[in-house]
Amino acid sequence: MEYPIQRHPTRAEQLEILATVLDDTVPDGGRLLDLGVGTGYVAHLVLSRRPDLDLVGIDLKQEPLDAAKINLPNGSGGGRRYFVQGDLNRLAEIALPHASYHAVMCALTFHDLADSAKQAVIRWVADSLVPGGRFVLYDRLRLTEAAAFPLQQSLWRRIARVHGTAMRDAEDFDTYVTDLGQTNRPAALEDYLTWFRAAKLSPAILHLHGNIALMSASKA
């Protein structure tokens, strides 16, 4: 199984918080949907605490799903595991085993989507949640203020100094924007808050470290 926190040391606390809030808030035997399950690392953090949960993991490619099937066997606590190959840009074609979910999580997948697709997924998630359900989203944020960029550079240097591993850097704000390219498309925090509210979800910021955010959006 891939261990992403080895390359990005500040992720450890944020992912632990993600697992904690789902552990604390999803009911016994609840249904959890993971958008972009990959090989199952983040799902494993949750299921190691809550083997009773039914997990449905979606991923674009079959290869990581095959690995996830090995890494995430059916739980000793009674939870079942389902793996679905699906494209978040083609939501109508994704066939899910359950009609509704107590929680939906997504870690480091949204920045691959165009903003229009992000909004469509958020609306789809809102429709899929039971009343009181939550969407927990962990992803990069787009930096939008050139004047504040030196502060982000300082955070990156601190990570390298404290942890001995550099996450990334850019000489200036324009270089940062250029380096994002056409396929790395993080959204701004303000956009996420607007999109959540438009889908009638109540947003909250659970943890923010520079341009990496752990957010939630709850259904009334």
Model-derived features with residue positions:
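Conserved SAM-binding loop and adjacent beta-strand
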Residues: 2-19
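Class I SAM-dependent methyltransferase SAM/SAH-binding core
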Residues: 33, 41-91
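Conserved S-adenosyl-L-methionine
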Residues: 36
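A conserved beta-strand element that flanks and buttresses the S-adenosyl-L-methionine
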Residues: 105
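C-terminal alpha-helical "lid/dimerization" subdomain adjacent to the S-adenosyl-L-methionine
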Residues: 138-195
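Core SAM-dependent methyltransferase catalytic element
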Residues: 201-220
